[in-house]
């Protein structure tokens, strides 16, 4: 993505020398048959004022369907998880149609595990990108994750965080 049209244009707009950028390479294990695949934002993108803090999560069963932009007719669980509120309520925006009706992709326990990880990631990276670094305004991290039981088949799936990076912010 370093040389995609969009990133090239953005560097040009901001006057960044194209030869001064580097590309990072991330290598992680393969997840050929994960139980759940998702992306999350560690702040509520629908709440610019910060008055309704929540984690925004898109998650799909398995790994066959794209999560954020699935094929036509496929829906993911899309939700707001109010992790810091009493009883940690979850508001579903859409439900996956790849799981049985009236069920969710993640269990309550998995949602809580994800919330703990997202909270830790948000807090840790605040030192570089958020309020702890003196930055003001809306701050969030974009996190890719999986739940997989390959290391212990038949046991509850383990949460794997594939990557976390600064979220560009409310569509900007």
PLM feature segments, named:
Residues 1-172:
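Conserved mixed alpha/beta core segments that line enzyme active sites in large multi-domain catalysts
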